[in-house]
Amino acid sequence: MKITVIGAGNVGATTAFRIADKKLARELVLLDVVEGIPQGKGLDMYETGPVGLFDTKITGSNDYADTADSDIVIITAGLPRKPGMTREDLLMKNAGIVKEVTDNIMKHSKNPIIIVVSNPLDIMTHVAWVRSGLPKERVIGMAGVLDAARFRSFIAMELGVSMQDINACVLGGHGDAMVPVVKYTTVAGIPISDLLPAETIDKLVERTRNGGAEIVEHLKQGSAFYAPASSVVEMVESIVLDRKRVLPCAVGLEGQYGIDKTFVGVPVKLGRNGVEQIYEINLDQADLDLLQKSAKIVDENCKMLESTIG
């Protein structure tokens, strides 16, 4: 199994290291446009092999030729939003980056599974799908896995219980448009509504929506990377080991939930072939309305990018 991570920043490098440490790849490529960064980080990771007991071949590179014949490619490359930059500016710049990255990936790998982490995530996943020409089941956005992890951690914090006993369902867009589905959120099989008052649940939902911004506020510079990287690796593990995990991911819908030709976060089965099944679960009307609203925002932004992404 050969896995490539595009972007050697905090998210990309942490993702690459966790993949190596969990022995999920025979060969791992960390690629970045900045010379020296992927080479140095890649070598540093490789030198942990004797301690971590893994033999993964790790290559840091600035040359897409080194990514040839990758089975999985993870795109983390992109710019953060800067002061004075409009959302439209960010969309255009990152769409251009993801377009170029995807074009270069496809020059060297015929049929990879592409996992997109770059923001705005659902829209960038659409860009990668359009440019790659791959079937929708092979282009996946990391969305709800991270959001559900945050929701679960906040619930555990509130109740003082193990995170392992908490299951949460978060659908929709990654960010303000996410839809934490309370009725499918449980603690050891017990509905969360039986354990916490509605106003507390509402506060936890809102904190989940602002989870990324909360970390940015603490850090002052930079954004979250441990939890995003761990979420990507959970997806990679399910694909590589054919685990058939049911995880919330941004995928291209074709009529499910009344949404068509739009990438949005829903529960899917992830296995060796990528997205092997999309689950259309029963939602309350309020949650369905929020999910469709989230998809509409993604669709509008994608239409704005049509001339950019070809």
From Swiss-Prot:
Recorded GO MF terms: L-lactate dehydrogenase activity; L-malate dehydrogenase (NAD+) activity
CDD domains membership: LDH-like_MDH (cd01339)
Reactions accelerated catalytically: (S)-malate + NAD(+) = oxaloacetate + NADH + H(+)
Keyword Oxidoreductase set for record: yes
Keywords: NAD, Oxidoreductase, Tricarboxylic acid cycle
Binding positions for substrate per the UniProt entry: 81, 87, 119, 150
Domain of life, per lineage: Bacteria
Known EC number: 1.1.1.37
Example of a GO biological process term: tricarboxylic acid cycle
Active site as annotated: 174
UniProt-annotated binding residues for NAD(+): 7-12, 32, 94, 117-119
InterPro entries associated with the record: L-lactate/malate_DH, Lactate/malate_DH_C, Lactate/malate_DH_N, Lactate_DH/Glyco_Ohase_4_C, Malate_DH_type3, NAD(P)-bd_dom_sf
SUPFAM superfamilies for the chain: LDH C-terminal domain-like (SSF56327), NAD(P)-binding Rossmann-fold domains (SSF51735)
Function, as annotated: Catalyzes the reversible oxidation of malate to oxaloacetate.
Subunit structure: Homotetramer; arranged as a dimer of dimers.
Protein family: Belongs to the LDH/MDH superfamily. MDH type 3 family.
Designated name of the protein: Malate dehydrogenase
Origin species: Chlorobaculum parvum (strain DSM 263 / NCIMB 8327)
